[in-house]
């Protein structure tokens, strides 16, 4: 149990997808203007990561040498299968949001289908394969990585909302000051890097 707790804390804080590995920055910067929209996208990313990492772990275990038949190694197909599973989960999420939460579906706009090619999603799945997590570890890691990404985007959205009323220089208004805020947040999260779990 302690191992899973340390893996969860590590994936949320120490190895944060957005602020430590700088993955998923396109949607991270573009959707961080309002806390409500950022929260909705964060929940969507938690859903996709929480399901795609363990599902891809099961698929990857079938691709390994000798899993299907002796002497058959299909690990060269891992990237295409990872992308296929991620795309299917995002399609399911998109249909669900369109039917049951149309306000969030419209607010996310083009960024919802872009979760399919969000490098944070693919990065977490690739880390799972590289680190050879078992199914339980992949569930914890997927949920933790999604929660960490959501924590980062909601925090940045909160800062961005407050900065609308600040007296920032004209040249830094908008994306410029957002980059600075994201950089300062990343520096703050670097303080977790020395923690050994």
From Swiss-Prot:
The domain of life for this entry's organism is: Bacteria
Q: Which reaction does it catalyse?
A: a ubiquinone + n Na(+)(in) + NADH + H(+) = a ubiquinol + n Na(+)(out) + NAD(+)
Q: Where in the cell is it found?
A: Cell inner membrane
Look up keyword Transport and say if it applies. Answer: yes
Q: Name one GO cellular component term.
A: Gram-negative-bacterium-type cell wall
Which top class of enzyme applies to this chain?
Answer: translocase
**Which Pfam family, any one of them, does this sequence belong to?**
Rnf-Nqr
Q: Which residues cross the membrane?
A: 11-31, 35-55, 76-96, 108-128, 139-159, 175-195
E.C. number(s) listed in UniProt: 7.2.1.1
Molecular function (GO) terms for this protein are: oxidoreductase activity, acting on NAD(P)H, quinone or similar compound as acceptor
Q: Does the keyword Protein biosynthesis apply?
A: no
Q: Which InterPro entries does the protein's record reference? A: NqrDE/RnfAE, NqrDE/RnfAE_oxidrdctase, NqrE
Bilayer topology reads: Multi-pass membrane protein
Question: What keywords tag this UniProt record?
Answer: Cell inner membrane, Cell membrane, Ion transport, Membrane, NAD, Sodium, Sodium transport, Translocase, Transmembrane, Transmembrane helix, Transport, Ubiquinone
Q: Which GO biological process categories is it annotated with?
A: respiratory electron transport chain; sodium ion transport
Record text on subunit structure and interactions: Composed of six subunits; NqrA, NqrB, NqrC, NqrD, NqrE and NqrF.
* Family in the record: Belongs to the NqrDE/RnfAE family.
What is the role of the protein in this entry? Answer: NQR complex catalyzes the reduction of ubiquinone-1 to ubiquinol by two successive reactions, coupled with the transport of Na(+) ions from the cytoplasm to the periplasm. NqrA to NqrE are probably involved in the second step, the conversion of ubisemiquinone to ubiquinol.
Name this protein carries in UniProt = Na(+)-translocating NADH-quinone reductase subunit E
Organism name = Neisseria meningitidis serogroup B (strain ATCC BAA-335 / MC58)
State the encoding gene.
nqrE
